């Protein structure tokens, strides 16, 4: 698997004095069931045993073991929701 951290995400992490992120496929409950929701957070996960570790552009990226991708790669980026920037992961298959 190839993991990249784009320029926007690197700037976001530098602004928040972070050098690592972790990502997994979470879920959002709705009336119709659970909708898969890829998630990414700054920092390190509580249990490193559950994650594979990658380094991209000086950023440590922890990816939950068993994560499936659409094309063999994940990209950590930043999206803007209303006026707030937040980390996002692209390329997870679900």
Regions found by a protein language model. Give the residues of each.
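Domain-level signature for proteins that mediate thiol-based redox and metal-cofactor handling
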Residues: 1-94
